[in-house]
């Protein structure tokens, strides 16, 4: 069993919390774009509050532990490991409750290069506990606006975890998929599930648009978020997102394995 102290030490050593790799300038830019209601950073959320830049900086200081000083505009951002641990505990409680009730779940990631293994382990554990891990809209095309213009992607699943790929053959199946912030894939998945007569997920687990897109539609959603992803924390503050865990979402995949073990243990799903 991984102790809280051991996980805290790992979070700091791996750069998952403490001083993280996200530049302060990038976080502040995201807050500025969110305040302007730029859909690229809303991630499918339709916030009800005003949420100006100063409001967002205060919120992110409270939720993540970043500096609340608006004059601090350069360097690397900081995540308080205690907030990460509290978030993981709340995240694990939701996963455990879903497993206990054996509800249908949907898992999806916009960070397949880094986080796919984390979600695959959760999908395996939830399936073993009797949850139906949904895979709707597999093979469906979704047009997503990127910085390069509108690109067509395909919804795909790897061991129960949704992601998007560029069209074409996926080779031997080891291709990790594309990075995406868009809520369109989760909307496509939910629409496909509804068209097929259900069931719909009672819990969505993921990041980026998978969480905010589902939460905005009234489905319980939990996920991981970096300091430049204010939408998940706004969603948590407003009630559309159940749990947003502050953590660097861009470190090596192996560094998330202790988080997986911790969550599964706390959720009573360790095998």
Predicted segments, located by residue:
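Metallocofactor- and cofactor-centric catalytic cores in central/energy metabolism, strongly enriched
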Residues: 1-101, 105-110
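A cross-taxonomic marker for long C-terminal extensions/tails that follow the last structured domain
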Residues: 182, 186-227
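Generic hydrophobic alpha-helical segments
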Residues: 91-95, 186-193, 259
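C-terminal functional extensions of proteins
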Residues: 199, 214-271
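Anion (oxyanion) recognition and catalysis
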Residues: 99, 127, 215
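Gly/Ser/Thr-rich loops at beta-strand to alpha-helix junctions
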Residues: 108-120, 207-212, 228-229
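Long, charge-dense
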Residues: 118-185
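Short phosphate-binding/catalytic loops that engage adenosine nucleotides
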Residues: 103, 131-132, 219
């Amino acid at each position: 069993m991984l102790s809280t102290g051991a996980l805290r030490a790992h979070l700091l050593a791996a750069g998952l919390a403490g001083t993280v790799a996200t530049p302060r300038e990038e976080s502040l830019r995201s807050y500025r774009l969110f305040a302007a209601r730029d859909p690229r950073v809303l991630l499918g959320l339709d916030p009800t509050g005003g949420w100006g830049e100063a409001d967002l900086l205060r919120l992110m200081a409270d939720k993540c532990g970043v500096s609340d000083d608006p004059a601090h505009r350069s360097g690397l951002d900081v995540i308080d490991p205690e907030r990460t641990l509290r978030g993981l505990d709340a995240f694990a409680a939701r996963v455990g409750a879903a497993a206990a009730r054996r509800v249908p779940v949907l898992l999806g990631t916009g960070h397949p290069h880094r986080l796919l293994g984390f979600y695959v382990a959760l999908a395996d554990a939830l399936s073993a506990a009797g949850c139906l891990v949904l895979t709707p809209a597999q093979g469906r095309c979704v047009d997503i606006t990127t910085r390069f213009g509108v690109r067509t992607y395909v919804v795909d699943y790897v061991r129960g975890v949704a992601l998007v790929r560029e069209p074409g053959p996926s080779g031997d199946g080891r291709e990790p998929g594309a990075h995406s912030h868009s809520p369109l894939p989760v909307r496509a998945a939910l629409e496909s599930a509804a068209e097929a007569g259900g069931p719909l997920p009672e819990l969505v687990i993921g990041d980026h648009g998978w969480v905010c897109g589902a939460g905005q539609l009234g489905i319980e959603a939990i996920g991981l978020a970096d300091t430049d992803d204010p939408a998940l924390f706004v969603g948590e503050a407003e009630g559309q997102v159940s749990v947003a865990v502050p953590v660097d979402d861009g470190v090596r995949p192996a560094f998330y394995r202790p988080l997986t073990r911790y969550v599964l243990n706390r959720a009573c799903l360790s095998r």
